[in-house]
């Protein structure tokens, strides 16, 4: 199946000019890696969070959003994840893309300039029009109001 492609404007800021643009690691990758545009290395201690610059600004087209997600290897091997995962970048945002990382391990972790720290997906979004009703859908769904843990282990 052929994936659709969209053009997204991107600009490297002065502190990110030497870094790679976000890119797919493999042909079938869903997300593109984002790089740390830190001037100096930073140590992320256990349970600390850090807003890491990427050195880029992007112009996401209307009808799309950017989703910032953790890199699975960083999370599994080092406990480093994106705090507000997935982070949402709205199509009208024009500031620098920054990543809010947190260290959930019990060991300090050093983030160096150029490290791949997260991934970004550009995805279509719908805009909701609420249908406010006094009588709510009474149709049985099998789940109904069952919430957390209701579908079993």
UniProtKB/Swiss-Prot annotation:
Task: Give cofactor(s), names only.
Answer: Mg(2+)
**What terms describe the molecular function in GO for this protein?**
dUTP diphosphatase activity; magnesium ion binding
Enzyme Commission numbers on file = 3.6.1.23
Q: In which pathway does it act?
A: Pyrimidine metabolism; dUMP biosynthesis; dUMP from dCTP (dUTP route): step 2/2
Tell me what reaction this enzyme catalyses: dUTP + H2O = dUMP + diphosphate + H(+)
Kindly state which keywords UniProt assigns to this record, in alphabetical order.
Answer: Hydrolase, Magnesium, Metal-binding, Nucleotide metabolism
The protein's enzyme class: hydrolase
Q: Which domain of life is it from?
A: Bacteria
Give the binding site residues for substrate. Answer: 71-73, 84, 88-90, 98
Q: What does this protein do?
A: This enzyme is involved in nucleotide metabolism: it produces dUMP, the immediate precursor of thymidine nucleotides and it decreases the intracellular concentration of dUTP so that uracil cannot be incorporated into DNA.
Q: Which HAMAP family match?
A: dUTPase_bact
This protein is called Deoxyuridine 5'-triphosphate nucleotidohydrolase
**Species of the source:** Wolbachia sp. subsp. Drosophila simulans (strain wRi)
């Amino acid at each position: 199946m052929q994936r659709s492609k969209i053009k997204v404007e991107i600009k490297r800021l002065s502190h990110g000019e030497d870094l790679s643009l976000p890119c797919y690691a493999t042909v079938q990758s869903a997300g593109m890696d984002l790089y740390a545009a830190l001037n100096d290395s930073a140590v992320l201690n256990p349970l600390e969070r850090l807003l890491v610059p990427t050195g880029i600004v992007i112009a996401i087209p209307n009808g799309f959003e950017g989703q910032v997600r953790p890199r699975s290897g960083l999370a599994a091997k080092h406990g480093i994840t994106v705090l507000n995962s997935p982070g949402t970048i709205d199509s009208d945002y024009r500031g620098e893309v920054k990543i809010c990382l947190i260290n959930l391990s019990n060991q300090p972790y050093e983030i160096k300039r150029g490290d791949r720290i997260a991934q970004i997906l550009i995805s279509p979004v719908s805009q909701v029009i609420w249908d406010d009703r006094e009588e709510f859908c009474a149709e049985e769904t099998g789940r109904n109001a069952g919430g957390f843990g209701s579908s079993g282990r």
